[in-house]
């Protein structure tokens, strides 16, 4: 993994990772039990299981700000990663955003996930939500991924952990108001470049 920012930036708030918002703080306080590993597991399972994946659910709402994702209870993979990272940072756990480029029909789509510093080790964690064919379990010891990119298909794991959402991703989310149409019409980013 490469890091796009200074260590303290992985605890900072921004317009999407608004971990100082009362909604994020309330959820974080409800999830805080035990050590950082237990807290990270609780936050992961909360976002994975209690925030629906908009495309899976056919939900038209487009959320991108962590507090909105948590209050609305829905979001695409990117938005769910924003919420997870915000919860981790609210609990004092360094966390950032990661991306993968995956095959999607005849083209590609960028998939969003998170990385966190747990027990002095960075692991990538994907809270996108389970469904048939996808069953991601929390791990503090190794990456917990929904998808394993296949380089033979042109897929890739982007190696960088970002402290803030990639502008390409955030611009797409902020410029649409219908998630179903955005997904069906191929408006999701196909690359970060």
Where are these regions (language model features)?
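Residue-level signal for well-ordered alpha-helical scaffold segments within enzymatic catalytic domains
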Residues: 45-49, 86, 90, 116
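Active-site neighborhood of thiol-dependent amide/isopeptide-bond enzymes
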Residues: 54-112
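Secondary-structure boundary elements
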Residues: 2-72
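His-Asp-centered catalytic microenvironments across diverse enzyme cores
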Residues: 2-7, 12-19, 98-193
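Generic marker of "main functional regions" within proteins
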Residues: 34, 53, 57, 61, ...
